[in-house]
Amino acid sequence: MPSKTLSDFKDRLLKPSPKRSEKSPATKHTLPAAFAFFLISIFIPLERAFWQGIIARRRELYPHVNFDHLCFADVLRICIQTIFLAFFTALPVRDFWQFNPLARFIRAVIRLVGRIGDSIGRLGGRIIFNIGANVVKSRRRVGRKQVSKFQNSIFWAAGIVAGLLAILCITQPFNVQGQVVFLSIVLLSAWSLTHIKARISLMLLFVLSVTVSGRYLWWRYTSTIHADGAISLFLSCLLLAAETYAFIVMVLGYFQVCWPLDRRPKRLPADRSTWPTVDIFIPTYNESLEVIKPTVFAAKNLDWPEDKINVYILDDGSRDWVEDFAKAAGVHYIKRDEHNHAKAGNINNAMKLTSGEFITIYDCDHVPSSDFLTSTVGWLVHDKKIALVQTPHHFYSPDPFEKNLHLDRAMPFENSLFHDYIQKGNDTWNAVMFCGSNAVMRRSALEEIGGIAVETVTEDAHTSLKLNRRGWKSACISKPLASGLSTESLSAHIGQRIRWARGMIQIFRLDNPLLKKGLTLPQRLCFMNAMIHFLHGLPRIIFLLAPLPYMFFDIYVIYATAAAIFAYVIPHMVHAAITNQQLQRGYRYPFLGGVYETVLSWYILLPTTVALIFPHKGKFNVTAKGMTIDKKYVDWHIATPVLILMVLNLLGLAIGIYKTVTAADPQVSTLIINIAWIAYNLLVLGAAFAVAVEEIMEHPLPRVPLKAGAVVTTSDGTKHAVSVVEFSQTELVLDMKGLAADESVVIEMTGNGHTDTFKATVAREAKGFTEFDLVFESVEDEIRFNRQTFAREGHWGDKFDSHVDDRFITGFLRLVGFAAYGFKSLVEFLPGTAGRFVRYVVSFLPRMPKASVGL
């Protein structure tokens, strides 16, 4: 006889739903449920204790089955899920890894290789330390003035020798077996170098990566092009051209950052009366007051003598309310009658009306800390040939990638690689690029080149190129001294990148750094790499489509055996991945670079192509900032190209699996290679689609973490010393509890050499903290609050989160998670009949239980 558990289960299944109306009789529910129970009981002995335990945990084990409203299809869902649970959760992964002999052998090999790598790393570290010590002694002997010549001679000599050896290694012919042996040795060397924490080890990784990738490219040019018809030849050459482009960008990138310069602020003279005059330019066009306010107030709070600083709002929108705000805030207001040349024209117009020795430019959403000028102007005073000091662009609101992929706050943002690392490499070669904001410029240098460049839509990069061509120096301070608003939506983000891509290609055509006079060779290479980087649209699309001709039409784009492909392609990819991981560690998470490029590739393809042919076409578009998103949705307009590529790759995957099952043995290995390629493409495309799923913005004004203390005085006079958690323009979140809603308090904060108090009311208690609404009675109150928060000295450089695991395998697993979220969102949001059909089919797929289960 069935137990009470089984009886209760049967009663619940056959019980009519209380939500059914008279027009929907209970039989519509009970008949399918009864039939389902009958079918299940035929195949499964439900009366046994094991299955009674399953029944008791049915909602946990079968999360996609609604046991209150069973239907005929649920029989199949339950059967599929049961098989899945039996095969994939019967033995926990930990037990498999611990008791399986093969797994134990693999683990032992990994430990052995790890010990060898650690030993080599320690030995290499000692050798490199001794080399470094000798170099330091040599520097002391040759003297300070001769150090740069000594370093340059060593660098160029080593570079020439390494280049000759690399050419020899690249062109030396090997058979497949010899290639495997050679690259195994190189791979072991590269892996060992990752254990050595020294700059020279990274340079050696560059050499190995260029050698392996160069050898792959040599093999591609000499052995894999087969004229088996015009279409096959065209597709082969197209892929080879894309790979050549990627190789060139990779080599230039290695050169750019081979010896980054971590420049620190230069101390100003102790006598503040000798400090130079500075004009602060804040250009604006159509931004809201909420966007402009923090920047203007922070400019007012800059640590600089009052008689030597002037703040100007440059309003290209000619709005009366902006002029009124400028008067209330105590800053200057400039507008112009003719609105030509967009932002560049706006700044050039202001230059005619001002006279400061130096000019500082902030986009109207970029908020500086109070020490911005004291940390940057020192270099301009110290070296009269420096025309530009650029600081990193950081952002206090999440960009679409952070927001929509739910990235940890500790993970580097999309721009971090360029602003925090590549710019240091540019500084080594005197090729720092002006980024349009968060920079100080020498007025006389700008006047010498005719002001900000107006010939292209990326006036900032073009201006720095012109300055370098005239012999002026540029520098960057690696310390974050300002932070801004990210683009809130993916469409706005793409619009901004389209302008950047178009502008850089315009410079490439109109003022090519390789052809014009006045630049050193390293400067030419740095600027060239920055420009051709934005040509990645077509190569990226080619890589996403390359395996499909073979799947659809049996057309070879790489004419080679599977063994040769493994011997050449895999080492090329692995070395590039290892080197980039070491190069970008702390500045970009593994595999996210491919996702960034995939999202943008379709959209920058046409603008860059047009700019190559018609460089004078295109106009400046203002990036939208300060918008809000109050509902989760998929931006189908933006996601359509990714969706098309996903469908094509899914079709290719299905055809590939079918061919693998039915093909002759010699073709299987080639099919497996193409299937693996398509599978990786689908991971990248799935993650790219996930970025198009716009998440809700929790707060109308972005909240910013802050490390600071505060004293709260409640209505009864009690004082509480607390910590600040985060803030916005009108809110403050403190680490305290127990206050009544709407209670009036006074909050005291100390920072930047001042103690300020603010009135506030308790808004709510949430997540263990108390949120306060600030009560500002004047503009001066807002300026003082800005001084304690946005403009707080050193604030933008604070680190708030622990380190994020950025190992290679962790990055790949995270990519898989992003892709899974993207495909899940596609199923969830796909509209119309197609969406309903896909969701119905997907409902049969098994899924992991809601909790860890061992059957």
List the predicted regions and their residue ranges:
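A conserved acidic beta->alpha catalytic loop
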Residues: D315-V322, E338-H339
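Structured alpha-helical
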Residues: K632-L855
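Short, acidic, metal-binding catalytic loop of nucleotide-sugar glycosyltransferases
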Residues: F297-K308
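N-terminal membrane-anchoring/stem segments of glycan-assembly enzymes
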Residues: P2-R272, H536-F543, P666, L671-E694, ...
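The conserved acidic donor/metal-binding loop of glycosyltransferases
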Residues: D363-V367
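Membrane-embedded multi-pass helical conduit in multi-pass membrane proteins
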Residues: Q177-V181, I185-A242, H533-K619, V634-P700
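Cell-envelope/extracellular polymer assembly enzymes that use nucleotide-activated donors
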Residues: T277-D279, N310, H462
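Long helical/loop segments within the catalytic core of UDP-sugar-dependent glycosyltransferases
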Residues: Q256, I334-F358, S369-V457, N468-R469, ...
